[in-house]
Curated annotation (Swiss-Prot):
The gene is orf53. The keyword Transferase does not apply. Coiled coil: none annotated. The lineage of its organism: Viruses, Duplodnaviria, Heunggongvirae, Uroviricota, Caudoviricetes. Disulfide bonds: none annotated. The keyword Protease does not apply. This is Putative tail protein. GO terms for cellular component: virus tail. It is found in: Virion. Pfam families: Phage_tail_2 (PF06199).
Length: 193
């Protein structure tokens, strides 16, 4: 059986162009998409019609939940209004590089602008936002390093996809890092449920 890709292993990072800082991971992303659309023109001739080429438009899009202190959501909203150039990475965290890229992961690299920020809120719900990011030119394939802050956040969740093989069994630190519900026995009165 094929080893299917798990969407949770795809990590989306952004960085404002020109800043010498680690890229920021989008948190609480619930949906992600990447589309490429070719705008081709057809020209009719006496020998039939043919495509004259055209341009390709690439767009990243997604939906993320918001949380108190979510500065990144504000940053994306400002980037749409202020037309700020951003770098972006789509990293496949389960596909490590080889040889000189052994500490990195398969990735796509983009440069472009955030074109849409839409806040969505409903009664008794969790706020979320949708974004669209328009890619300048063609994306590049390569391998990317996950910033230390990102790897710490991923490890702190204690939960990631594990394969069925013994080589990827849940053991050691991964096992003890999984958050578990706990009851503080000092606050429970006997007979109480």
């Amino acid at each position: 059986m094929a080893n299917m890709k798990n969407s949770n292993d795809r990590i989306i990072l952004f960085r404002k162009a020109g800043e010498k800082v680690d890229a920021t991971k989008m948190l609480f992303l619930t949906e992600y998409g990447l589309s490429h659309e070719a705008d081709t023109d057809t020209e009719d001739t006496m020998d039939g019609s043919y495509n004259t080429g055209g341009s390709v438009e690439s767009t990243m899009s997604g939906t993320a939940k918001m949380f108190y202190g979510d500065d990144f959501a504000d940053e994306i909203e400002d980037a749409v209004v202020d037309r700020v150039l951003y770098e972006a990475w789509e990293v496949e965290s389960r596909i490590p590089g080889k040889n000189g890229d052994a500490t990195k992961f398969k990735a796509k690299y983009f440069q472009g602008f955030h074109n849409k920020f839409e806040l969505k809120a409903e009664a008794n719900g969790i706020d979320e936002y949708e974004y669209e990011y328009g890619v300048n030119g063609r994306f590049q394939r390569g391998f990317a390093t996950l910033p230390e802050a990102v790897t710490k956040k991923l490890k702190a969740t204690g939960y990631r996809f594990h394969d069925t093989t013994k080589a990827d069994a849940l053991t050691g630190e991964d096992l003890t890092a999984i958050p578990q519900p706990k009851v503080d026995s000092s606050t429970v009165t006997p007979g109480e449920v």
